[in-house]
Amino acid sequence: MELSGNTVLITGGATGIGYALAEAFVEAGSRVIICGRRLNRLEEAKRNHPEIDIIQADAANPSDRARLLKVIVENFPSINILVNNAGIQKDIDFAFGELNFEDIQEEIKINLEAPVILSAMFIPHLKGKKNAAIINVSSGLGFVPAARMPVYSATKAGLHAFSIALRHQLSRVGIKVFEVVPPAVDTELNPEGRAKRANFKIDLKPAEFVAGVMEELKSDVFEIGYGPSKKYIQASRAELDEYFRMMNSRW
């Protein structure tokens, strides 16, 4: 993938990995539009990087998705890269917890439904564009699920499968499909869960992770891991089962 000269839309682009990707694409010489739910964080990103365009939109909301498509097509018709990055993560205990079905549905809508539907909506506008691509941000937990985050793990496993199938289909129309597979990165994801695990320290910063991602994108590596998540991508089923036992031994 060429990193410069693109028009890139990044969902969930105001914070964390999405924001680091936005900074990296701007630095590489691409035009970047970010969308997200929180206007204050979008405006903060805009203050830091005036060249970034911002759109307040909830990727999980059908009417917001339709509006987002309309705004992009009308104002940024050169769009050639869609980054499905928006995501949420929740600790959910199906055995002993008080289940909130709205929380479960929200996690599925944002993490899996949104990237699938947005891909379908934007593909007609990516066809025929130079350097066209869809970049899906999944998770190492899509390969080795965390028992305390069953819905999150399931949505990311679904996004992994979707990325494989979509890559095969879109190879016929010149659109590349990349999957970025983060390990644990120090972001605002799941603050409630992290508060319960104060002794679990995450050292990897979004900018460091994304620097590695950009190098892999440049080399057309279609499944991009980092540290433990790179091992998960390359592991056999027996190895994945062992990683699962190790990760969840105290659950």
Sequence positions of predicted segments:
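Conserved glycine-rich cofactor-binding loop
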Residues: 7, 12-16
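Conserved glycine-rich Rossmann-like NAD(P)H-binding loop of the short-chain dehydrogenase/reductase
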Residues: 28-44
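The beta1-alpha1 cofactor-binding region of Rossmann-like NAD(H)/NADP(H)-dependent oxidoreductases
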Residues: 57-68
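Conserved mid-core segment of classical short-chain dehydrogenase/reductases
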Residues: 89-105, 148
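Active-site helix of classical SDR
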Residues: 119, 155
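Residue(s) in the substrate-gating loop at a strand-loop-helix junction
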Residues: 139
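C-terminal helical subdomain
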Residues: 179, 195-232
